[in-house]
Amino acid sequence: LLEYFKAAHAALNDGGVFFLDLFGGPDSIQENVDVITHEGFKYYWECQMFNPMTNDCRFAIHFKRKGEQKRKDCFIYEWRMWGMMELRDLLEEAGFSKTIGYWEGEEEPDEDGDVGGDGNFYPTEEAEQCEAWVTYIASMK
């Protein structure tokens, strides 16, 4: 990963920015399936495996169109789950002059008291642990 970050740094113009997205939280490493329903189809995000000794994991995306059979394992992802600070440390080691973590704001609680992200991200160095989260890192050359 360090070599990849070094290559990304070298490929940027002066003043360039390299963005990464990452996700985490306790729900993100549980073997389960999240189902998202859209008009005419369902999208499935499945955590198929998580190894707590190595943080290696496998995720899959499945789809089902209305009136059709479910298409399983359309996309398979196998990677290591990295933490925000691990990545920021590696980015600094790769030569980036500055990194900024962006955290998602929260929407108003629903009738069950559940709170989700509002789609707006802001720079911060502190965040509450959420069941699941998505965040971004901006890395300046």
Model-derived segments and their meaning:
Residues 8, 49-51, 126-128:
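Short Gly/Pro-enriched turn/cap motifs at secondary-structure boundaries
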Residues 1-17:
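A short glycine-rich, Lys/Arg-flanked "PGG" loop and its adjoining helix->strand segment in the class I
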Residues 18-19, 98:
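A short hydrophobic/small-residue beta-strand
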Residues 19-90:
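SAM-dependent methyltransferase
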Residues 4, 41-44, 77, 102, ...:
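Sequence-level detector for tyrosine residue identity
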Residues 81-141:
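C-terminal lobe and adjacent flexible extensions of AdoMet/dcAdoMet transferase-like proteins
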